[in-house]
Amino acid sequence: MVAAVQNATGVSAGVADDALVKLEVRDLTIRYGNEAALSNVSLDIREHEIFGIIGPANAGKTSFLKTLNRMDMFNSNMHVDGDILFNGLDIRRLKNVYALRSRIGVVFPLPVGLPMTIYDNVALSPRLSGMKDKAELDVIVERCLTRAALWDEVKDRLDSLGSLLSG
């Protein structure tokens, strides 16, 4: 299904007409194989503007959000054309995707892990920060899962896919 994403007419209430455009999307098309999830979407989101994306299931909302912080890179079947500028910079040309994700976050309604084990999902951030020591990672993973009240449930299946956890 192809969804049309449109910005509200005019500038949102409480946002100045001359407010800085923080996010520009131009002619964005998202495809899975030959099927378009979105086609030729263009919009501007201004500083301090509150912007919502609504639509029916399978209309391309999540696909759109994943492109904003380059989470689409985790899906080899997802092809993105068009331009996305954040603070005037093309997000596809940014070398540090983690810095981008620290500025553009996406919170999904249900927990969504990466296609890795439970252990690797929890250890991802420390590893990206340069931590390599297995003993240190083990301590961090156990501490994080304990704080999330999950340790007792998953301690014997840390090598299982995180996506297999019930929601």
Model-derived regions, located:
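ABC nucleotide-binding domain signature
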Residues: G52, K66, D83-I84, Y98-L110, ...
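ABC ATPase NBD coupling module
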Residues: S76-H79, L89-G105, L128
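Short helical segment in ABC ATPase nucleotide-binding domains corresponding to the A-loop/adjacent helical element
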Residues: N69, Y119-L128, D138, E142, ...
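A short, flexible loop at the N-terminus of ABC-type nucleotide-binding domains that lies
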Residues: V15-K22, I30-N40, E47, D72-N77, ...
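Conserved ABC ATPase "signature" region
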Residues: D83-D90, K134-D156
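Conserved catalytic motifs of ABC-family nucleotide-binding domains
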Residues: A59, M73-N77, L110-D120
